[in-house]
Amino acid sequence: TDYISKFEEEIIDAIEGNKNVKDSLLNYLQVFKYPNVERVTYDRNEQIYKNQIVPYMGKLIVSNITGADIKRLISTLTDKGYSFSTVKQTYNLLNEYFDYLMREEFIKKNPMNAVPTIKKSNYLAKQNKEVLPVCETITVFTDEEIEKFKAEAHKKYPSGKPKHNQAAAYILMLNTGLRTAEALGLINSDIDLEKKVMHIQRGVKEAQKRDGTERKSGREIIVGKLKTASSKRIVPLNETAIQAIIELRNERYFGEDAPLIPDADGNFTRPLNLRKRFYSILDAAGIEKKGLHSLRHTFATKLVTGVRAEDGTVKALTPRQVADLLGHTTSEITEMYYVKRNTDMLMGVTNGFEL
């Protein structure tokens, strides 16, 4: 009798719908997500699982979960002040998970059907935050900050040694709009100084060290594909960018097949180290802390809004041209981030349209 009872319990436990969310969702991540997504993406999914889902829903039985349970989770995360991005990713992971359970017929009803898609405007309103156009949420350098940053980046000790290691990398990023992963992924043979171009072909990211799906201590560098297909592109080099490349090679050069921005051993540099050195320059220059991506935003904003020449003319690029330079999939993305509404240009345009 005990044997039969134990056997029946094992059968019940083996049914996915009878498991708790903690065990079932972890199994889904390890079996279905890990083999099919980038390591960095898996790390993020795992963090969402551990920090945003398990503490609040981990003990619930899968087949008993209702839309109300998930709405309650979203509401809790909102009240705790989590960013829209974090809560949206939580929603997306749960949506994928319950869709999988439905396809495999582990549950009879999908609770996500009762949970509306999260809208950013509604989410921010609930947190009493102002809803701003995307172009007003990005951080860029002012002209004064650019000059202060460049002055600090070029400083040297009396011995002639640069004060900041590989500071020319930031000048290169400021003049090309490269993403951090793209800049670190450059190898010397990607660059043609005669033609004044560089070929963006790979990216460098950091991920959790693992033995299969099992986490190990520390982080490791992942050299792999770019963010999107359009990220693979040819980027023109202005004279400032060319000089930055020459400075980087004078500081460290390990050959044509080595990274342009190598570590001391000639290997790819960790993104974390590049960020730390960037913050060090900002601090020394007395500039308010900004993300490294601000260099890209500044470059793109300058291209769209234009640069005024000495004769008063303004040189600017179209959103389509900027999109191609940045590796955006569409020019709509470029417009959303970098084209600001100019209501002054609307003055008088309705004259003659009296109805």
Predicted segments — roles?
Residues 143-147, 230, 236-288:
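Active-site/catalytic core of tyrosine-dependent DNA strand-transfer enzymes
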Residues 88, 103, 107, 113-180, ...:
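Basic, Lys/Arg- and aromatic-enriched nucleic-acid-binding interface segment
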